[in-house]
Amino acid sequence: MMRFLLALALTSVATTAQRPAGDAALARGDTSAAITAYERATDDAQAQTLAGRLLLTRHIAGMVRSDALSRSRAAFERATELAPDSAAGWLGLAETHRAAGDILSRIQVGRLLDRAWEVAQSNPGTVGADVAYQAARYRWERYEGRANRYLFNLDARTLSPEVLLGDWREVQDFFARQVRRDPGNPGSEDLDAAEDRLRSALRLNPVHLPTAGLLTVLLGERGRWEEALELTQQLVRQAPDSGGAWALRGLALSRTSRTGAAQQALDRALSLLPPDDAATLRSLQPVLRPRDEARWGSLTPAARTELERLYWAAAQPLYLDSINHIRVEHLARAVYVDHRWRDPLRNMSGRDTERGRVYMRYGPPDTWASFEGGRLSELDPDAADPVLDAAAMLETQRTPVVWLYERSELRFLFSLNAQFARDNFGSNFREVYRRSQDIFPARYDNLSLVADMDTVLVQLAQFRGARPGTSDLGVFAFMPLGRMARGAEAGPLPLRTGAILKDAQFNDVHRSVDTSSVLPNNPQQVEMRTWRFNLPAGQYFMRVEATLGGVDRHARSSSLLAMRSYPFDSLRMSDVLVADAAAPRDSSYLSWRDFFIQPSAGRFAPGDPVALLWETYGLQPDSTGAVRYTIELTFTVREVERRGFAARILGGIGDAVGLSARGDEQVALQYERSAQHAERQVDWLSVGLDDATEGLYTIAVTVTDRVSGRTTTQLRSVRVTRGELVR
């Protein structure tokens, strides 16, 4: 008996001595030696907990048989035997069950987390907060599988992926006729429990970021973003130097339409986060086309930063506004998905989940529908196999989740594992997503500024500048004031208009902004604005914008612009300026600036005259000092089939010598001109397209120098329509 007691005592001393050895090994970075030492301390609960925690980090998610996971579970089981009042031991044991690949292990997670929470009640601080957070996350994941539940009507039994892959009208019909929203609000009890645990966690640790993040998302899910805003305000007060806290603040501000403040908060977050975390948050990779993702990975950090700057400069909805609403939305989505769908156990961010990827690109869906597990045909072909045992049957009862986007007609199908909100694309929707990335790399339709943005019709025309090496740019813009002012009360409204030119690096070259007061009086009212710029040859980005105060409506036009040079030793033409009317101010006109021009947006009603004006440079004089050249105008129908239309010259020239039809869809006019030699030759005329049907027409103006034999051509498109001429 004495020998047995002595041996037992010696064993206890030996195992207890292993923890300091494990601590020393861990301090020098030798985790293998630390695990071995901790596992040998079989009578030390703390050592067993440390062993379980280290082993759990070595588990590879998705492995069916994992030695690391088995040993981790054994260590945590021993820790709970030795110290049943240890919350850390029970929490670790719950995590090993959650990581398991079988449903029977995972359905025990709730019970183990409840036990961990019971013993953590008297243990304030980080451990108690971690336990409460994990318990809340478990409840949240249960809710994820039951949120937005739809019920099948009596005559419908399954949701076929073929329905979702069909015509958009079939998808709409399915949701209108075959299913209905569950009025019982399933999952609300899990949501209540999750909120209760999260608030308990914050009482234990007010700056526990995972808890604050999930609670922010949860409050948003319940339409309580103002409460979330108050929560994040308290968070940044208590942790003013936390980038994660400011990121959550930015999310809540953006979702309560405080976009300017959200931009400031998110920029503050990026300045405070560790460099790697900041780079991940602002990364463009989640919104790139697949072919561009590899190139992104090969860029240096400096090159990525510059590309991000250029990307967001191009994406900014309005240059008249200092707030980049799309960039704010991108960052807010990144914060949202990371807290909603993150998987701490698998060390997976929310952006790496299937739903997270879709959300990053396309934002919140217009329809979010989940269906009862096992009701999705062709996703679970073995679900009805009678030889499957109960656990395997449960494993196949995945939850189908459908997301629909109205404006883009995108649709996605996900499949969620039972008792565990790990999602995958259902059926062949991974391929659907891949194709969608090429068509729509990213969309921001959830922003009213983007979704309701109207169009400014703009005509740009280039002419040779007065200074060598420069060109004049005429900008003729048509603001759809009537549409922008729809629903506005009577009275003057403030209108801001602007033409902004940027260089290839998106730095301002010219910015011309005008503020006025307008009185809308009909739905088709148009405000015209004209700008003229003198620019050297090069690549530019042109934006014309209009914002109407009082109703918060906006319109814009964006153009990539290649300013040409006009050498003096060759035959060249300016752009062809299309107008409703054009006439010289007097008989001594020398350039396009000497004309009265009533510009057009390129839209004409059937039978309306089309005025054309252009300049020709480099005509060669003959021995008498005169220039002689031929002008040919060709009108071609591009979008409709038109049989036998005719054109006639209304004014501007008196020496037309030819008119010919070329097939059923083209008509040509030809005439000759002669004049005294000048640096530039201005030509103008008005043409009526008799009986022209509605459609898109291309006008080709060709000038042939009869002295040198050289030829030059410019094209312009016009649309003939009976609809609103501003559209």
Language model segments and positions:
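Amphipathic alpha-helical repeat scaffolds of TPR domains
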Residues: 43-60, 85-101, 122-182, 205-217, ...
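N-terminal leader/linker segments that initiate helical-solenoid repeat arrays
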Residues: 15-60, 66-70
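Structural marker of alpha-solenoid helical repeat scaffolds
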Residues: 44, 82, 119-123, 204, ...
